[in-house]
């Protein structure tokens, strides 16, 4: 049986971005749940979350959440008494911006210098350890449980015809309200200026 991997990119490197950190600090279990669901869907038994070492609270909460999930039988062998086994490891990024690129991130998880690989082959064919891999960011994984609970039509009812759902943005700078805002895809800057006017 060929090994497959599920990888989460929690290494947001854009200046002023803290969307991933907020999710990982506030509700790390939602990402673990989504990764296990993804693992089940593709037949993977191992996942990795790649997170910035500069996010010590996120790292600590992820470590606690992974331990709790293992204790409750939500990660590990024979989840819910089935033949499905899936576990998640945590890998800390060293702050290299290039590791936000998916192939560089996988190279870093493998223990090598985080440098991009030529494509093709694409990660779905030859990704982590040269095995089929799905890689998504924190926000994408965090959406999965909500879509399963509320249905695809619910998610598709937000956004535009070509870009469904919502997007989280970090608002900063010389504005009235800083922080995170989740808005439907396709929302124009004019639509949310009331959030940001000084």
Task: Tell what function each PLM region has.
Residues 1-7:
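Conserved oxyanion/phosphate-binding beta-strand-loop segments in alpha/beta enzyme cores
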Residues 9-20, 170-175:
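Gly-rich Lys/Arg/Thr-decorated short loops/hinges at beta-loop-alpha junctions or inter-strand turns
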Residues 22-28:
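Short, glycine-rich nucleotide/cofactor-binding loops
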Residues 28-40:
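Histidine-anchored nucleotide/phosphate-binding helix
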Residues 47-53:
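Short internal beta-strands
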Residues 59-185:
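Hydrophobic alpha-helical positions that pack around
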Residues 187-189:
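Short, structural beta-strand-to-alpha-helix junction motif
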Residues 193-198:
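Conserved small/polar residues in nucleotide/adenosyl-binding loops
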């Amino acid at each position: 049986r060929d090994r497959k991997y599920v990888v989460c990119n929690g290494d947001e490197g854009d200046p002023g971005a803290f969307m991933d950190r907020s999710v990982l600090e506030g509700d790390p279990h939602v990402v673990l749940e989504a990764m296990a669901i993804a693992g089940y869907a593709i037949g993977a038994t191992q996942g990795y979350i790649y997170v910035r070492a500069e996010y010590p609270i996120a790292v600590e909460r992820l470590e606690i959440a992974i331990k709790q999930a293992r204790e409750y039988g939500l990660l590990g062998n024979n989840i819910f008494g089935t033949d499905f086994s899936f576990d998640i490891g945590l890998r800390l990024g060293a702050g290299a911006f290039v590791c936000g690129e998916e192939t560089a991130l996988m190279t870093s998880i493998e223990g090598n210098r985080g440098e991009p690989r030529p494509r093709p082959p694409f990660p779905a064919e030859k990704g982590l350890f040269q095995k089929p891999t799905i890689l998504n960011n924190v926000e994408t994984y965090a959406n999965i449980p909500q879509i399963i609970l509320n249905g695809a039509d619910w998610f598709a009812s937000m956004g535009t015809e070509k870009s469904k759902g919502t997007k989280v943005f970090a608002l900063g700078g010389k504005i009235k309200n800083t922080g995170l805002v989740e808005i439907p895809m396709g929302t124009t800057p004019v639509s949310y200026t009331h959030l940001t006017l000084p």
